Structures are given as C-alpha cells and as structure tokens.
C-alpha cells in the first residue's frame, strides 16, 4: 500500500515542453525485471531510465523550441525577408538605370506604377474615412455650387482663348470644332427627353475628353508616353509569334493573315484573364469609374460598365455589373450599351495593331471614348427615373472564379478562341457579302451607263460632307468616307483592313496619284480615321449586344429592345466626335526629312520620305529647253541637285523627267 500510495503521489508531468518526467522514469525502473538488457531502437536499455518515447521527445526538444520561436516571430521574419528583397530589387533597379536608363525605362515605369498603387492603398486605409468625414459638410453647401460655376466659367474662357490662339496659325482646325457642335445638335434633336438633359454631365464629359486629348496628342510628355506605351504593346504582342510559329510554322505565320493576327487575340485574351484574376483590371476600372462619377455626376453602375469597356468587350463589360442590371433604369441601360458600341475591347485592340494601325492612336481613342460615351448617352437618353445606384457603396466588382493563375491563363486562352473564330468568320462573310454587293451595284449601274458603281463609291458621296466636318482634307474625304461607311454598315475589321492597305501604300513610297486616282491618304487623315473607326457601332453589333444582355436579364428583353437602336446611333456619334477631337488637336510631329542631304544617301528603295523629297524636288525644278534644268528653293545652287533629279526620275514619272 505504501508503495502504491507512493506511486500515486508522484506527479506525471507532461513532456510536451521537453522537461524530464521523474515519476515516469521511476515507474519504468520498478516494472522492468532486474538484469533486463533489452535495448530500444536507439541502443539504450530500458534500465537506464530512457524509454523510446522519452528519448525521442528529448531529442526533438531543440526542434520544437525552434519551431515555436519561428511561429511566434513569423510576421517579423516575413517583414525582414520582404525588406531584404526590396533592398535587393532597389539595388538592381538602380544599377540597371545607371548603366542604361533607356533600356531600363520599362522596368522603371512598372516599378513606379506598383509603388503608386501601394501608396494609394495605404493612404486610403489610413486617411480615407477621415477625408470623407471632412468633405461631407461640403457636399450640399453653397460653396460647392459656387465652385462648380467658377470652374465651369474658367474652363469656358480657357477653351475660347486656346481655340483663338491655336487656330490662328491653323484655321482649318475650326472645321472639326464645328463638327463637334453639329453632332451635339444632332444628338439633342434626337433626344428622348429634351427638357431633362443634364448639361453639366454633357459638357463635363466633352471637357474631360478634350483635356485628355490635349495631354495625349499635344503635350510632348503625353505624346511621348503614349507613343512609348504603344511601342511596348506592339513588342509584347510580338511574343505571340513564338507560340504561333511553333504550332503553324514560320511560313504560315509570316504570309497568312489568319495565322498572324488571330493568335494575337488568343494571347491577349490569356493576359487579360490573368490580370482579371489578379484583380488589376477591377482596380483600374474602379478608379476610372470613380473619377468619371465625381466629375460627371453619373451613377455608379453605368459608370463602371463604361469604364470597363476600355479593357473588355461590349458583352463582357455588363458582366461587371451583372447583379444590378435588373434594377437599372432605361437611361442607365442605354449608357451601358452606348459604352459598348463606342469602344473596342483589349483583345480586338491586338488584332487591329497587327493590321498595322497606329497603336498609340488606338489606345488614346479607347480611353477618350469613355467620358464622351457617358456624355452623349445622357444627351440622347437623359435620366428621368430615380436610380438606385447613385453611390458606389454596395456596388462591388466580382473577382474571377479561377483558383490559380494557371487556370485563369488557360480559361482566358480557351475563351479567346471563340472570339478569334468569330473574327475570322465575320471577315470571310462580310468581305464576301461586300464583294457581292459591289458586283450587284456595278451590274445595276452598267444598265444605265454608270461605270464603277460600288458600295464604297456610294458611301464616299453620301458621307463626304460629314467626314469633311471631322477635319479631313477634301481630297482625302472620299477614301475616308468609304471606310466610315464600311465600318457602320459592314464591320470595323474590314474598315481597318482597308486603312492598313492605304497606310502600307504610303509607307512604300507609292505615288499619291496614279492616273487621276488617289492611292493613299495623309498622316493626318490616317489619325482621324483611326479615331472614327474605333468602336463596335455597326449594324451586326445589335444582335450581339441584345443576345449578351438578354442572357443576363431575360425579363428585361423588351426594355433592351427599346433602347438598342438609339444606343447604336449614339455610339457611332461618339466615335465621330472623338475623330473631331483628333482633328482639332492633331499637328504634324517629328522632324521632317532633310531632303537636301537625303539624296546623298543611297536610293536603294522607295519610301514615304523618298517620295516626299522627290515631289519637292520636282516642284523646284524648271526646264530651260535644251539647257540643263534650273532649281529653286532649297535645291538652288546645289551641286548634287541634278544627280538627285536623275535618281528621283528613276523611281517616279514626272513632266520634268522627260
């Protein structure tokens, strides 16, 4: 009994903390018979007081202690590791910038953007609620009202002064300004509720578009940034060749359009899906929508959808606000549709760039269209109902359903296959239909002795005045009018393909006029045309938009059908207003070719610069009968002028070459 009671009095302390349990050791000694020599896996006899479990626990004690320490200070270790990585990256970036800043410019820009996002998020968490509380008293104050009117007055005076000073040197820029006024009057005349138009929203949207256009087109910094951005996008899209060449072969990728442009859609769709999964697309859309909402006074849902159209297509953007479409007003639905018709998606942007269209102009046109789409929509279909979404509180953008980046990339590529095949099918069908229409019109014209009657010719006559109001030179108007007509009645892909053909002819140094027919359009006309074609506003898009929105809110099919035609017309006007903005703001950039020294270089091939220099030389040349020709202007008294004339006559036919 004493021994038993003695055993009970011994405390069996735990070994979880690594301490020795004397009670357990004593019990093991008493149970084991004398003389026992049995050895455990570690070579220790049980008689020495160290059984298997006791020894293992004691041997694991340092590791348990270390693991416990790591768990306790895990956050500190992460911060230290993150700090070391940031220091290493900063050192790497500094070294790259010192060695060659131009080469490291892309990395520097990406780093600045990441820092901006992180600082913005930090300040929003730290000061966001405080700033909201501080600004809340001014929301309905008289000071805010006066501030709006003062800002509007200053903006109007600034616009008048700018137009007066800028157009003094180039009076032709007033023509597209009159074009903007013309399109605004047309939209107002077709407005659903004339008395309900919010002119603050209209002029705020047009003002934002104008200011952004000045930054992008006229300022050196903005122009350089978007030119650089366009070049980076082109370089990035060229990586598609690595995948398409492996699948189809180098020959097909270089020579066949379907294997050159369509894989870009798949690659870009994959990238957009990854960015959407990471939340970057939603973040940018929310910031753009917030800025548009506070400046224009539009509701949260319609602004989010229009801002989303900058990055995704007209069927994908409504998915951003899918839970709210059922409760949106007709004016808001009209704005959502207009935004889809007035812009292009990021995936299609890659295909247009593959055509050879200027990337920076496409990006600028897509961004500039967003505020103009909201303004034009509220002019054509003003709000007369009470919206439930005046504030963006409670309106959240959904995240992707994918579980990891690889799944997002795969789903994006697979989804883009449908878009790529849709583009290919549309090009095949619409080009065939256009050829048939032209053949039928030509046949009908020949019956009454009208030669060469085609769909393009009809558009060139009907739309020529409108195109002239966009700022296009009169000699270029027929060709631009053809493309605008093709874009609206056929497809924007066919129109951009035609534009790329004109651009390639110009760059190849082809003569501007051959047998009385113009072969290409000027650079100014190319830029204006790029803006005017940048949108999905064509007749075939009506079915696409109705089908996409009806699948989301089938109970509102009748409401969607009521506004879709008006939204199509409004979206087309948005693209034309953007083209007018480009016509006002565009000025020739870049140093002109030094034509006097240019002939000293080898005349190995024809280029646009060669043609322009030779045309100037032909205009400066005077024939003197049997005497050698004389030269005027910059070619006067130049020893090599005669040699340059001989070289130019080898490329181009001119009367002075006889």
UniProtKB/Swiss-Prot annotation:
Catalytic activity: adenosine(out) + Na(+)(out) = adenosine(in) + Na(+)(in); inosine(out) + Na(+)(out) = inosine(in) + Na(+)(in); guanosine(out) + Na(+)(out) = guanosine(in) + Na(+)(in); uridine(out) + Na(+)(out) = uridine(in) + Na(+)(in)
Keyword Heme: no
UniProtKB keywords: Cell membrane, Membrane, Phosphoprotein, Transmembrane, Transmembrane helix, Transport
Broad class of where this protein is predominantly found: membrane
Biased composition annotated in UniProt, kind: Polar residues: 1-20
Biological process annotations from GO: adenosine transport; azole transmembrane transport; inosine transport; neurotransmitter transport; nucleobase-containing compound metabolic process; nucleoside transmembrane transport; purine nucleobase transmembrane transport; purine nucleoside transmembrane transport
Membrane topology term: Multi-pass membrane protein
GO molecular function: azole transmembrane transporter activity; neurotransmitter transmembrane transporter activity; nucleoside:sodium symporter activity; purine nucleobase transmembrane transporter activity; purine nucleoside transmembrane transporter activity; pyrimidine- and adenosine-specific:sodium symporter activity; uridine transmembrane transporter activity
Positions of region (Disordered): 1-55
Sequence intervals crossing the membrane: 80-100, 104-123, 148-166, 172-192, 200-220, 233-253, 260-280, 295-314, 336-355, 362-381, 423-443, 454-474, 529-549, 567-587
PTM sites of type Phosphoserine: 45
Cellular localization per UniProt: Membrane; Apicolateral cell membrane
Any matching Pfam family: Nucleos_tra2_C
Regulation: Inhibited by formycin B.
UniProt cross-references to InterPro entries, sorted A to Z: C_nuclsd_transpt, C_nuclsd_transpt_met_bac, CNT_C_dom, CNT_N_dom, Gate_dom
Tissue distribution of the protein: Expressed in heart and skeletal muscle followed by liver, kidney, intestine, pancreas, placenta and brain. Weak expression in lung. In testis, primarily localized to the apicolateral membranes of Sertoli cells and vascular endothelial cells, and weakly expressed in Leydig cells, peritubular myoid cells and germ cells.
Entry GO CC: apicolateral plasma membrane; brush border membrane; coated vesicle; membrane; plasma membrane; vesicle membrane
Biased composition (Basic and acidic residues): 26-41
Role of this protein: Sodium-dependent and purine-selective transporter. Exhibits the transport characteristics of the nucleoside transport system cif or N1 subtype (N1/cif) (selective for purine nucleosides and uridine). Plays a critical role in specific uptake and salvage of purine nucleosides in kidney and other tissues. May contribute to regulate the transport of organic compounds in testes across the blood-testis-barrier.
Family: Belongs to the concentrative nucleoside transporter (CNT) (TC 2.A.41) family.
Protein name: Sodium/nucleoside cotransporter 2
Organism of provenance: Homo sapiens (Human)
């Amino acid at each position: 009994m004493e021994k038993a009671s003695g055993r009970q009095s011994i405390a069996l302390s735990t070994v979880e903390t690594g301490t020795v349990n004397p009670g357990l050791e004593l019990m093991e000694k008493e149970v084991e018979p004398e003389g026992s020599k049995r050895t455990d896996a570690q070579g220790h006899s049980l008689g020495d007081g160290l059984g298997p479990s006791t020894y293992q626990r004691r041997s694991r004690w340092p590791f348990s202690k270390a693991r416990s320490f790591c768990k306790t200070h895990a956050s500190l270790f992460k911060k230290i590791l993150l700090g070391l990585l940031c220091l290493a990256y900063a050192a790497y970036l500094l070294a790259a910038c010192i060695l060659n800043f131009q080469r490291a410019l892309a990395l520097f820009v990406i780093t600045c953007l990441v820092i901006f996002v992180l600082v913005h998020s930090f300040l929003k968490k730290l000061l966001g609620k405080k700033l909201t509380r501080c600004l809340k008293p001014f929301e309905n104050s008289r000071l805010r009202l006066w501030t709006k009117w003062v800002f509007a007055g200053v903006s109007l005076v600034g616009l008048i002064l700018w137009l007066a000073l800028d157009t003094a040197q180039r009076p032709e820029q007033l023509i597209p300004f009159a074009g903007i006024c013309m399109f605004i009057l047309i939209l107002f005349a077709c407005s659903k509720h004339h008395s309900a138009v919010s002119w603050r929203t209209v002029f705020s949207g047009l003002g934002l578009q104008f200011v952004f256009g000045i930054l992008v087109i006229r300022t050196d910094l903005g122009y350089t940034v978007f030119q650089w951005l366009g070049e980076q996008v082109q370089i990035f899209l060229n990586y598609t060749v690595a995948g398409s060449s492996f699948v189809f072969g180098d020959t097909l990728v270089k020579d066949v359009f379907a294997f050159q442009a369509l894989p870009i859609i798949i690659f870009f769709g994959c990238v957009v899906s990854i960015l959407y999964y990471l939340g970057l697309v939603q973040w940018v859309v929310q910031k753009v929508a917030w800025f548009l909402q506070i400046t224009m006074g539009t509701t949260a849902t319609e602004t989010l959808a229009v801002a989303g159209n900058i990055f995704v297509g007209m069927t994908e953007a409504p998915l951003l606000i899918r839970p709210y479409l059922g409760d949106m007003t007709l004016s808001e639905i009209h704005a959502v549709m207009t935004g889809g018709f007035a812009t292009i998606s990021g995936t299609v942007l890659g295909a247009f760039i593959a055509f050879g269209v200027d990337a920076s102009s496409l990006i600028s046109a897509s961004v500039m269209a967003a505020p103009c789409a909201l303004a034009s929509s509220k002019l054509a279909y003003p709000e007369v109902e009470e919206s439930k979404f005046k504030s963006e509180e409670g309106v959240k953008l959904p995240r992707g359903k994918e579980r990891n980046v690889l799944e997002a990339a795969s789903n994006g590529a697979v989804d883009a296959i449908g878009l790529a095949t849709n583009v290919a099918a549309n090009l095949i069908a619409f080009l065939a239909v256009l050829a048939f229409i032209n053949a039928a019109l030509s046949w009908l014209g020949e019956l009454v002795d009208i030669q060469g009657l085609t769909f393009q010719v009809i558009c060139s006559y009907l739309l020529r005045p409108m195109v002239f109001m966009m700022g296009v030179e009169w000699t270029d108007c027929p060709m631009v009018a053809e493309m605008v007509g093709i874009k609206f009645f056929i497809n924007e892909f066919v129109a951009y393909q035609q534009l790329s053909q004109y651009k390639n002819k110009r760059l190849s140094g082809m003569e501007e006029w051959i047998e009385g027919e113009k072969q290409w359009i000027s650079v100014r006309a190319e830029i204006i045309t790029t803006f005017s074609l940048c949108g999905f506003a064509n007749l075939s898009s009506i079915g696409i938009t109705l089908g996409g929105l009806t699948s989301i809110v089938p109970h509102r099919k009748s409401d969607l059908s009521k506004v879709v035609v008006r939204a199509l017309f409004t979206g087309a006007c948005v693209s034309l207003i953007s083209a007018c903005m480009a016509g006002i703001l565009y000025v020739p950039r870049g140093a002109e070719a030094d034509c006097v020294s240019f002939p000293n270089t080898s005349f190995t091939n024809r280029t646009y610069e060669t043609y322009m220099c030779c045309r100037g030389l032909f205009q400066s040349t005077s024939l003197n009968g049997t005497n050698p020709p004389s030269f005027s202007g910059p070619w006067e008294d130049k020893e090599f002028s005669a040699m340059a004339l001989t070289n130019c006559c080898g490329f181009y036919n001119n009367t002075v070459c006889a």
